[in-house]
Amino acid sequence: MTTVPISNIRNFSIVAHIDHGKSTLADRLIQMTGGLTDREMAGKEQVLDSMDIERERGITIKAQTVRLAYRAKDGKDYIFNLMDTPGHVDFAYEVSRSLAACEGSLLVVDASQGVEAQTLANVYQALDNNHEIVPVLNKVDLPAAEPEKVKQQIEDVIGIDASDAVMISAKTGLGVPDVLEAIVTRLPPPKGDRDATLKALLVDSWYDVYLGVVVLIRVVDGVMKKGSRVRMMGTGAAYDVERVGFFTPKMTQVDELGPGEIGFITAAIKEVADTRVGDTITDDRKPVTEMLPGFKPAIPVVFCGLFPVDADDFETLRAAMGKLRLNDASFSFEMETSAALGFGFRCGFLGLLHLEIIQERLSREFDLNLIATAPSVIYKMKLTDGTELEIHNPVDMPDVVKIEEIQEPWIEATILTPDEYLGSVLKLCQDRRGAQKELTYVGARAMVKYDLPLNEVVFDFYDRLKSVSKGYASFDYHLTDYKPADLVKMQILVNAEPVDALSMLVHRTRAEGRGRAMVEKMKELIPPHMFQIPIQAAIGGKVIARETVRALRKDVTAKCYGGDITRKRKLLEKQKEGKKKMRQFGKVDIPQEAFIAALKVDS
């Protein structure tokens, strides 16, 4: 492929809410510029969503990149570097790094659904990166499409001019040539100096079985050449570049990448953890002094324990997590043991969707059957002796007497909902200890901003929001700060033994409701044993809820006919003694479904 002047390069990303059609638009752009032939595209949708789970759920998880060659109407040849980014809030870090590598964005909005909460979040990120934004209205061929109304919405909510928005239908290809022209005429070319020292941004990295770690880069200044020796400024490690190339989406090797270009390098790097996203890559012999403004590393927000149902699968689980970790640096895990569930891992995730996807990938790709404990967040604790702790497992919480203050993380949530469901949405947020910040109307929809404790959101807030709004509300959040909270550690005791996998930190006002709901659920699902089993929810030494599973008993008086009552009483007393002894030494088997159901209860 011949080199093109930097003024003819366009680097852009597509930002949109889940399901507004950005991966389908990417398919059309690839097809119309000849990145893949019609035969290669046949029977394949969402070419860039390479994981099965991405296609099946219709979501993009990993940011993908593709280079396209395009001859514009002005007769010049252009190079487009397209970054397909995820739309879901958990993967916002994937979005941030893709946006930093581009100069412009296509904002795709579904003409029948309008602007959604995550569209807003991603657009604001693009504006923070000084992007030029071209609004694109997708699905205009649907009977429910209201392009004029949505244009007005884009102007009202986001504040960018949408009068010349491109009207398309990504599925049929209608209007897609206009998008290609808009990229040429309305998005700016990158800036960069070919003669300066090499400076490149590390956008992403993943593990390839044959090539080792593949690093996705955006060259800012200088030239990235095959055979040169480069240094990662964040870690200080130096490597020899073995391959240089780009994706069309097929891997294509070249000798060098110039300023403004996006491509990949391989350099015998052993682990993805050695390549920090947002790092600056420079020439090892004459390095630059200033690093590029990088990204914040992705910090896990939600934690939960994952345990294999079959204890023999422990090593398989360890290996599987190691493999997933190769490609997902934001996923962390450490070993933990539980008296009830045996050996497992305490894992950190970016959010609930991330947790769900990792769990699903473990069960699907590695055929593992897992139990997940209740998700929890990181709490900060100040002890009476002045030390400060961070705790992400309720089991590790110190004695109440030693704690001076507990702080929990809070988020700012933006919820967009149709007007008729506003009441139910506000009630849900109030029930979750939320504080309303603002309420504005965008056409027939309300946009609410709420401060909420993350602890209340990680359980089932998203599912509840979808059910109270019949699936119409959309939700996005970002962490704000830590605030002091009146939290207590609630334990569930079965036959006077605490079940560590079910202990959790809850707000004092909600402890009783949740405790009662959990013990009632457990009572239904623990089968009767030969002795009675008390199930209790307790805070410290105080029991706040109790249910009892009745004992199975044999009718010991069946063979006594008439006669003296003392004989019957003696047999009943003897049975009672036996049951008492049994209860002392008996072990209660808690079925797996009892755990799962207890963790899902709504108080």
UniProtKB/Swiss-Prot annotation:
InterPro entries xref list: EF-4 (IPR006297), EFG_III/V (IPR035647), EFG_V-like (IPR000640), EFTu-like_2 (IPR004161), G_TR_CS (IPR031157), LepA_C_sf (IPR038363), LepA_CTD (IPR013842), LepA_IV (IPR035654)
Gene3D superfamilies, per the entry: 3.30.70.240, Elongation factor 4, C-terminal domain, Elongation Factor G (Translational Gtpase), domain 3, P-loop containing nucleotide triphosphate hydrolases, Translation factors
SMART domains reported in the protein's UniProt record: EFG_C
GO BP annotations listed: positive regulation of translation
Enzyme class: hydrolase
Subcellular location as annotated: Cell inner membrane
Main location: membrane
EC id: 3.6.5.n1
HAMAP family per record: LepA (MF_00071)
Full protein name: Elongation factor 4
Organism: Bradyrhizobium diazoefficiens (strain JCM 10833 / BCRC 13528 / IAM 13628 / NBRC 14792 / USDA 110)
